[in-house]
């Protein structure tokens, strides 16, 4: 039997298991979970961006546009290219509100 790791998604604490050869996103989808957004599944769109809060992992190839080196050094990864090497705690990425978004919300 192969090794299995548990991934906990914050906020909310939803959990799913992941095998070492599966991406975190693929493992989540196969278990019918919806705790992370799903995009291209190929590392090119950045929609499934997460921050690894705890645990060991490896990352596959991703678009530098959506995940620059500085972000990777701060623990950010794309779930579609995130391979657990231990139990992980990850955090969903939320884009900071831009002024135009705030202005638009205030007008509504």
Swiss-Prot record:
Pfam families: Fer2. InterPro entries: 2Fe-2S_ferredoxin-like_sf, 2Fe-2S_ferredoxin-type, 2Fe2S_fd_BS, Beta-grasp_dom_sf. It comes from the Bacteria. [2Fe-2S] cluster binds at residues 40, 45, 48, 80. GO terms for molecular function: 2 iron, 2 sulfur cluster binding; metal ion binding. GO terms for biological process: catechol-containing compound catabolic process. Belongs to the 2Fe2S plant-type ferredoxin family. Ferredoxins are iron-sulfur proteins that transfer electrons in a wide variety of metabolic reactions. This is Ferredoxin, plant-type. It comes from Pseudomonas putida. The lineage of its organism: Bacteria, Pseudomonadati, Pseudomonadota, Gammaproteobacteria, Pseudomonadales.
């Amino acid at each position: 039997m192969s090794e299995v790791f548990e991934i906990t998604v914050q906020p909310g604490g939803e959990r799913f298991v992941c095998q070492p050869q599966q991406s975190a996103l693929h493992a989540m989808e196969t278990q019918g979970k919806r705790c992370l957004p799903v995009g291209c599944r190929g590392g090119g769109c950045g929609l499934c961006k997460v921050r690894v809060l705890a645990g060991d992992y490896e990352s596959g190839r991703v678009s530098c546009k959506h995940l620059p080196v500085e972000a990777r050094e701060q623990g950010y990864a794309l779930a579609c290219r995130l391979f657990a090497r231990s139990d992980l705690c990850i955090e969903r990425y939320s884009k900071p509100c831009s002024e135009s978004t705030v202005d638009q919300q205030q007008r509504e």
